[in-house]
Amino acid sequence: ILRQISSVGKSEFVPLMQKIYSEPIKESLILQRINDIKEKGGIAALSGTPQAAIKFKETLVNSKIDLFFLQGTVVSTMHIGMDGKETLNIKSLCQSLKVPVVAGNCVTYEVAELLMKAGVAGLMVGIGPGAACTSRGVLGIGIPQATAISDCSSARDDYFKATGRYVPIIGDGGIITGGDICKCLACGADAVMIGSPIAKSSSAPGYGFHWGM
C-alpha cells in the first residue's frame, strides 16, 4: 500500500489515501497489534483521534497499552462524536484508562492549562508549522511555533507551581534541523516530535514520502 501511495502524483495521492482509509478500523486488529508488541517486550503506545477514542473507549480501557496519545489537529477538553451526540470528556478518559494520556495539539496558554487540569500527562504543541500540515491553508488557523511553545510552557510552569505536578511539553511541527530542536528547547519544550528527517531515512516505510492530516 505504501509503495502504491508513493508512486502516484501530488494531485492523486489524497483521493487514493481516502479510498484506502475508508475501510473501517477493526477492533480485533487493534488488540492483536497491542498484544504483538507486548509479547515482544515492547512499549505499546496507541494513538487515536478524539472520535476514535469515543468509538473504541471500551477497547482502550481493556487493552494492555502503556500510554495513549490523543491526537487531533486541534484538541480541547470536550469533543463531540461523529453522530453529533456522544461526547469525549478528556478528564474522564484520563481517569478510566489508568495509563498516561498525552494530548494535543494545542497552542495557547488557556487550552494548555485546561488540558493539564483535566489530567493529561503530556502536551503536544503546534498547529500549522509542520511540513505536511495544511491547517493554516485549509482552516486558516495556526500560531508560530516559538510563540506556541513559549505560551504553553508558561502554563506548564504556572500549573507546576500551583499543583506540584509537572506536565512535559512536546514541540510538534516544523522541526527539521538540530537548530530547530534547540529553539524549541530554548522556548520551553521538554521534547520534540519530528517527521521529515525520519521520513527521509533509508529504513522509512514511506520510501521518503510522508503525508499530513
Task: Describe every region a protein language model picked out.
Residues V99-V101, Y166-G173:
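A short, small-residue-rich loop immediately preceding and capping a beta-strand
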